Amino acid sequence: MQQRQLGSQGLTVSALGLGCMGMSFGYGQNDERQSLNTLARAFELGINFLDTAEVYGPYTNEALVAKAIKGRSDIKVATKFGFRISEQGEGRARMTGANSDPAHIRRAVEGSLQRLGVETIELLYQHRPDPAVPVEDVVGTMADLVREGKVKYLGLSEVSSATLRRAQAVHPISALQSEYSLWSRDPEWDILATCRELNIGFVPYSPLGRGFLTGKFPAADTLAADDFRRTLPRFQLDAQAHNQRLVDR
């Protein structure tokens, strides 16, 4: 497996990473044993870069990843904070808005460390921008966690080039994560160029279009009732039929 360096601070990961969200959140129910077998096979193939978040579950995805990496020191896990999580409801219904308040960041990191069973988080992302908290305050808190040894490298997700520049001025950012695939190409407008300029790694999520570009995607109305893709315009029946014709070319 080829390796890639993300940013300028020393983070090196496998060229292919594995996003774990769908194993316990967002895409309907999944079998834990099957998910663990998938992770074990990924490790055999040389993948050492996993992506999770506290909000996936919530919390259960990090616990799943912890089972997969237990006893290993070669796997690099990225996790995220940035949402207010209600004690009420199930799944995505528990996400009640952005929260990157410094105190919340610290609570989230302590929780992630405990659930993942690690002493240090390899890569910590802000999951989404919080309009109520300046990015300088967010990254300042994250940088404090680096100095305290609780986090190694910092990342952001779905921010603009201007925000990325402001963040980089506070502390080196190792990775920027955004959706990027053949049918979601917004990063080509400017964010990829900004990442190159600032020497920040770019980590695409959903590179297979949330499964659609595999060529094996079922009709959206056959997805599980709690599969959030049912709510996305691109998967509505008319749009999906049009998009499928493009994939089939």
Predicted regions, residues:
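Active-site mouth loops of central-metabolism enzymes
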Residues: M21-R33, G91-R106, H127-A132
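Conserved, mostly hydrophobic/aromatic
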Residues: L6, L18, S35, A42, ...
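Beta/alpha (TIM)-barrel catalytic core signal, keyed to glycine-rich beta->alpha loops juxtaposed to Asp/Glu
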Residues: P129-R249
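N-terminal binding-site loop/beta-alpha segment at the start of enzyme catalytic domains
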Residues: M1-K76
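Short, acidic/polar
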Residues: Q29-A42, A98-G117, S160-R166
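A short, structured active-site edge motif that brings together acidic residues
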Residues: I75-S86
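Active-site gating/metal-coordination segments in enzymes
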Residues: E87-L123, E179, W183
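Structural motif
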Residues: R41, L45, R115-L116, G149, ...
